[in-house]
């Protein structure tokens, strides 16, 4: 009972009383407390006490058992026996029983690899820092208490599940969360996916210790529930597609993707809290679609944990040190060891090699070598030199199973899948015993590989042994399709698959495979891989889609210099993101052999920021120098794009020295969200290049002195920059004067993007220059620039006098109808030259549509109008449609996204399709259009007089009937393109 009171149980039950019952409770407390032989509490305090205050008073004045007995007595008198029964179960039973069950389940968990050394991490004592870390995840900001939605983001297998298990143990064993959550339920998406359909009640019952869970009681306090959704990427589907199918009934069976989507989208139990783990790729897809309260990045085991694991396993201190040193010297293996189960695998493999008297250095040559050595060791008995025929068949069956899983996005396998791939029922206990397979749930015959990367290496081995045409599943595709899917990151779950294929082609790996399986391997696969690279070489669009780091790791694992040089010189365009030390080393290994590069795009995030230890920084800078040497050895680099990169002074110096005398071929330079520790004039020296035509510095902070340096370059006679993008660069109103002079003096600048800078008063000086006859600017973006009502007169004057400006974007400013009226006076003039106007998020209403309609009837040059995210409504759009049908209107593209339209306006919209001969695109996303309205639109789109063929609609936003109708209309009308983004 002590723990229950410490959990504020009394307060919870007092909150269950309505106002009348609560008053009666207080009166009984005043009348009967002396009869019970207890000390009287001040009536003044009791009378004014809230439920929380009264709970505190009772806990303060009475011992726990008497206080609880008294509470039961008063509940009886006010006829709330239901609370008594529930409270007794709570004190003696349900949450306590559940916590005890979960503790037993986790500490004796055979459902995953926790039976190995992972148990050591679960058994580590919790420190105060651990508790603080866990508690901070669910700390509400400010005084408002609201449901928490927390993301754990980290690579596959990096230890997210381990952290979730430790968090649950912390909740079970300590008071860290007991006051916050009555129940924590853990759902692994890869397991849930196997169910196909389920209700939330059924998922909860699966975790319950008894035959049936008290669902009604559990769900009665949703704010006391935490749902852990682990490995969200395991659902392998878009959980945001089923808007119309979301459900709030916890007992109703749903497809599991709809069920999880209902939880994530807060349709079901919105008062509950969520803790979601996902890979960075999955998180990136969702971060703008879920309102989360906290994100924690999981980077895996720290060096001390890895070292400790080796010492625990080896016991012999010297051997442990030898093995750990080998791993520490190999950055790729060390990165692998940050994943708990792989740390155990690496240490086990090295231990076995050392105990057999073999040289462990050879298997640390690359990651592939260590994986294959570990796997082959599992199948070869301790004193044998080669595997039995049965072992060969078992591994071959596993490789076939793994390949099927990679192509079908399956990581949990039933017995039928095992049999289909040649694994007999009698093989399963052996594969479980050696640790190749793991039974994820004792009550169900479902299995996973030790780790997804083990499945990947087995799948790679399949391709070295057989052709895809020999596989029992037609889902398994050719090596060419595999490599393109891997390099283009079509399947985000494929982390090592392609690089293992390359790694297995190394001579030493070929010998190991031939020795294990007893036959020579075909060399055809190497030729096929080179053909893939040649295909990429001749296709610029394909090169844009290739993930450079994936390609680099493939070539690094192969460790074949001849093939590396040939492969790198197939590439004219490379795009890579280096997220850690290992990535930089691998990228350097490849790029120093690239002689044909024309376009380079990279991000090094904070890897080169100088935060590392001195010894690491030296090695990093050497590798960074190899990367930057590509500017010297590739003689024709035309585009350089840097993004999300923080360079220390030393790192910038390396870039500068390699680029300074070899930047003359650059015509595009992009530095987005880049931070340099250097003398800024050095960077601006790099853009003094007469061939440079496009410069984009968005999200890179520019001081006033930086702006002056930039404008000095722009003012030089030899400057040929045509497009300048300085969006979100912290440019101020004072900086506008500097830019204003450039608009007059520069004879090449045609595009200027100043979006998301606070220009305010500075717009006056810009507009003055824009009115100057020497200004040749054609394209101006001032979106989200904090423009106010005084700015519209200045811009109106520009629209009257400037004869070159064809595009103006002033979206996300408080234009309002009054400001729009000022601009429209200029736009209705017969000599207006503006062709494109963007007014998204400008607080325009129906009234403003009257002025826009006047422009459309009089301005024959305007071909694009974007008025999305304004409250135009059906009435306002009718005004626009009537104007679009006017013979003087030549509009081609109209944006009406999120304009609060309904199906009632579809007749008006449809009439523009058939009567306007120029309108080819209309964006209608995020409007409440209905089935009948869409039928009208689609009927118009089929008419011969219709010029429109691009329609912005999110098909999945509609109900099932409407979705089917739109899909059918697209099939009937081959010219029609319905797009979910415009």
UniProtKB/Swiss-Prot annotation:
Transmembrane segments: none annotated. GO terms for biological process: inflammatory response. PROSITE patterns: DAPIN, NACHT. Pfam families: LRR_6, NACHT, NLRC4_HD2, NOD2_WH, PYRIN. Keywords: ATP-binding, Inflammatory response, Leucine-rich repeat, Nucleotide-binding, Repeat. Residues 148-471 form the NACHT domain. ATP binds at residues 154-161. The keyword Ribosomal protein does not apply. The keyword rRNA-binding does not apply. SUPFAM superfamilies: DEATH domain (SSF47986), RNI-like (SSF52047). LRR repeats lie at residues 594-618, 634-658, 689-712, 746-773, 777-801, 802-825, 827-847, 859-882, 888-911, 916-943. GO terms for molecular function: ATP binding. CDD domains: Pyrin_NALPs (cd08320). Residues 1-93 form the Pyrin domain. Belongs to the NLRP family. PANTHER family: NACHT, LRR AND PYD DOMAINS-CONTAINING PROTEIN 12 (PTHR45690), NACHT, LRR AND PYD DOMAINS-CONTAINING PROTEIN 4A (PTHR45690:SF9). May be involved in inflammation and recognition of cytosolic pathogen-associated molecular patterns (PAMPs) not intercepted by membrane-bound receptors. This is NACHT, LRR and PYD domains-containing protein 4A. It comes from Mus musculus (Mouse).
């Amino acid at each position: 009972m002590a723990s229950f009171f410490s959990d504020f149980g009394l307060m919870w039950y007092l909150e269950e009383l309505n106002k009348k019952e609560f008053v009666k409770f207080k009166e009984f407390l005043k009348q009967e407390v002396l009869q019970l032989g207890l000390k009287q509490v001040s009536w003044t305090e009791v009378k004014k006490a809230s439920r929380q205050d009264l709970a505190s008073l009772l806990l303060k004045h009475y011992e726990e058992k008497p206080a609880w007995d008294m509470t039961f007595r008063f509940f009886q008198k006010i006829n709330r026996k239901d609370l008594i029964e529930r409270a007794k179960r709570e004190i003696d039973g349900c949450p306590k029983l559940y916590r005890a069950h979960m503790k037993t389940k986790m500490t004796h968990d055979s459902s995953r690899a926790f039976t190995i050394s992972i148990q050591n991490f679960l058994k580590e004592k919790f420190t105060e820092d651990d508790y603080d870390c866990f508690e901070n995840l669910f700390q509400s900001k400010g005084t408002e208490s609201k449901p928490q939605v927390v993301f754990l983001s980290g690579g596959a297998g990096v230890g997210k599940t381990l952290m979730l298990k430790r968090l649950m143990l912390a909740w079970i064993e300590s008071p860290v969360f007991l006051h916050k959550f009555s129940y924590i339920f853990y759902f692994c998406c890869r397991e849930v996916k196997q169910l196909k359909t389920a209700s939330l009640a059924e998922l909860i019952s699966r975790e319950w210790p008894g035959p049936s869970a008290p669902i009604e009681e559990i769900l009665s306090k949703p704010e006391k529930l935490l749902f852990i959704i682990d490995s969200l990427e395991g659902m392998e589907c878009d959980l945001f597609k089923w808007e119309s199918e979301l459900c709030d009934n916890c007992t109703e069976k749903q497809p599991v993707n709809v069920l999880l989507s209902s939880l994530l989208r807060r349709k079901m139990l919105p008062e509950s809290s969520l803790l979601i783990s996902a890979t960075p790729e999955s998180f990136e897809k969702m971060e703008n679609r879920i309102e989360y309260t906290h994100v924690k990045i999981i980077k895996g085991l720290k060096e001390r944990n890895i070292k400790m694991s080796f010492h625990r396993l080896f016991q012999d201190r010297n051997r442990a040190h030898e093995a750990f040193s080998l791993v520490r010297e190999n950055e790729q293996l060390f990165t692998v060891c940050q994943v708990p189960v792989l740390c155990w695998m690496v240490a086990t493999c090295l231990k076995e090699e050392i105990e057999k008297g073999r040289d462990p250095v050879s298997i640390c040559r690359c990651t592939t070598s260590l994986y294959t050595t570990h796997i082959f060791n599992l199948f070869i008995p301790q004193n044998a030199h080669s595997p039995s025929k049965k072992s060969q068949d078992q591994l071959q069956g596993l490789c076939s199973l793994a390949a099927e899983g990679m192509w079908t996005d399956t990581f949990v396998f039933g017995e039928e899948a095992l049999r289909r791939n040649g694994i007999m029922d009698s093989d399963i206990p052996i594969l479980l015993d050696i640790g190749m397979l793991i039974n994820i749930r004792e009550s169900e015959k479902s299995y996973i590989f030790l780790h997804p990367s083990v499945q990947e290496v087995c799948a790679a081995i399949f391709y070295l042994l057989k052709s895809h045409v020999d596989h029992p599943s037609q889902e398994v595709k050719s090596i060419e399709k595999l490599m393109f899917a891997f390099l283009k990151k079509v399947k985000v779950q494929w982390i090592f698959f392609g690089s293992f294929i390359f790694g297995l082609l190394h001579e030493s790996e070929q010998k190991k495979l031939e020795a294990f399986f007893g036959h020579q391997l075909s060399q055809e696969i190497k030729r096929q891989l080179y053909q893939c690279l040649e295909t990429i070489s001749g296709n610029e669009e394909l090169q844009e889609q290739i993930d450079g780091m994936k390609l680099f790791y493939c070539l690094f694992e192969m460790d074949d210099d001849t093939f590396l040089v040939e492969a790198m010189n197939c590439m004219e365009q490379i795009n890579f993101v280096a997220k850690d030390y290992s990535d930089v080393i691998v990228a350097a290994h490849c790029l120093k052999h690239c002689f044909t590069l024309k376009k380079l795009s990279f991000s090094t995030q904070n890897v080169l920021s100088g935060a590392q230890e001195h010894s690491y920084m030296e090695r990093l800078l050497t590798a960074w120098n190899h990367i930057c040497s590509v500017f010297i050895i590739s003689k024709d680099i035309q585009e350089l794009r840097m993004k999300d990169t923080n360079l220390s002074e030393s790192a910038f110096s390396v870039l500068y020295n390699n680029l300074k005398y070899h930047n003359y071929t650059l015509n595009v330079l992009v530095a987005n969200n880049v931070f340099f520790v250097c003398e800024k004039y050095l960077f601006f020296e790099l853009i003094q290049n007469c061939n440079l035509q496009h410069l984009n510095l968005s999200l890179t902070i520019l001081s006033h002195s930086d702006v002056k340096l930039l404008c000095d370059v722009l003012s030089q006679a030899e400057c040929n920059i045509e497009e300048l993008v300085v969006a979100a660069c912290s440019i101020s109103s004072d900086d506008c004067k500097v830019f204003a002079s450039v608009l007059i003096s520069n004879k090449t600048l045609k595009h200027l993007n100043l979006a998301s800078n606070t220009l305010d008063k500075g717009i006056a000086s810009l507009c003055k220059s824009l009115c100057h006859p020497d200004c040749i600017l054609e394209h101006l973006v001032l979106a989200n620039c904090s423009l106010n009502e005084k700015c519209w007169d200045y811009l109106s004057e520009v629209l009257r006098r400037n004869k070159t400006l064809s595009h103006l974007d002033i979206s996300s400013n408080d234009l309002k109808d009054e400001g729009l009226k000022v601009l429209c006076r200029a736009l209705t003039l017969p000599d207006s030259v503006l062709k494109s106007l963007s007014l998204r998020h400008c607080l325009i209403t129906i009234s403003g549509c009257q002025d826009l309609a006047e422009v459309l009837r009089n301005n024959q040059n305007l071909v694009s109008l974007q008025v999305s995210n304004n409250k135009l409504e059906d009435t306002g759009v009718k005004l626009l449609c009537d104007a679009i049908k006017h013979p003087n209107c030549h509009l081609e593209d109209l944006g009406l996204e999120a304009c609060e339209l309904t199906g009632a306006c579809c007749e008006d919209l449809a009439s523009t399709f058939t009567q306007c001969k120029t309108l080819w695109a209309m964006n209608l996303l995020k409007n409440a259009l209905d089935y009948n309205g869409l039928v009208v639109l689609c009927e118009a789109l089929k008419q011969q007089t219709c010029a429109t063929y691009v329609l912005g609609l999110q098909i999945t936003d509609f109900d099932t009937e409407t979705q089917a109708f739109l899909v059918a209309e697209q099939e009937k009308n081959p010219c029609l393109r319905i797009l979910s983004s415009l």
